[in-house]
């Protein structure tokens, strides 16, 4: 129903849909997921293991589901040739199913249209930005909601339009006494824009695992 310069939509006009999951109930398709943890607690190791599993079409952890597909993995902290690829090879990944966006001399930020284009061109089921702070841009203050929100909205729209599962890897802050939702670096809007927030940490009863 048109009213002035906007429309009114009643919920009776909206078709209910189920969430589709890449990995139930942790990583949904077409939405954002945050994966957080302290440095050294295994965030990248976990992500590379998951990507390797997808590349080979094997059973996902704690699941009877097998999913195969292309993953786009963007890592701004480690070298591709001497760190990332050797780690994927140790996980016995099929590297023909794993790629990254080479943006040449142009920094790849979360609002870059090349992200959506790369997902569509490859048919990727999963895209990972690791770590999130490396992809927000130098003029964006990730601690300010009005600064980070447009980037999160853009990336959220990209996930929805392409149906790709997008995972943002982030570090935790040093506030050990705070609630888990407030332990992530940056504005709470980062978590609020995400459908799923995952926390990786060491088992207190077995710190070696």
Regions picked out by a protein language model, each given a short descriptive name:
Residues 46, 50:
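Hydrophobic positions on the alpha1 helix immediately C-terminal to the Walker A/P-loop
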Residues 63-64, 189:
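Short glycine-biased active-site loop of nucleotidyltransferases that positions the nucleotide triphosphate
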Residues 11, 18, 22-24, 28, ...:
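Conserved inter-motif catalytic segment of the P-loop NTP-binding fold
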């Amino acid at each position: 129903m048109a009213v002035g310069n906007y429309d009114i939509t009643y919920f009776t006009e909206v078709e209910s849909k189920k969430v589709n999951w890449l990995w139930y109930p942790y990583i949904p398709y077409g939405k954002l997921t945050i994966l957080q943890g302290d440095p050294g607690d295994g965030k990248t190791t976990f992500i590379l293991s998951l990507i390797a599993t997808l590349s080979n079409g094997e059973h996902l952890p704690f699941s009877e589901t097998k999913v195969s597909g292309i993953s786009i993995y963007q890592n701004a902290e480690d070298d591709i040739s001497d760190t990332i690829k050797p780690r994927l090879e140790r996980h016995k990944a099929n590297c023909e199913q794993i790629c990254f966006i080479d943006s040449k001399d142009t920094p790849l930020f979360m609002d870059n249209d090349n992200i959506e284009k790369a997902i569509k061109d490859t048919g990727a089921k999963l895209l990972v930005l690791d770590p999130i702070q490396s992809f927000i841009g130098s003029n964006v203050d990730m601690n300010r909601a009005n600064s980070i929100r447009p980037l999160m909205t853009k990336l959220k729209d990209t996930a929805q339009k392409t149906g790709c599962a997008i995972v943002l890897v982030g570090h935790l802050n040093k506030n050990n006494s705070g609630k888990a939702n407030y332990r992530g670096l940056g504005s709470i809007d980062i978590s609020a824009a995400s459908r799923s927030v995952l926390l990786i940490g060491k088992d207190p009863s077995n710190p070696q695992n």
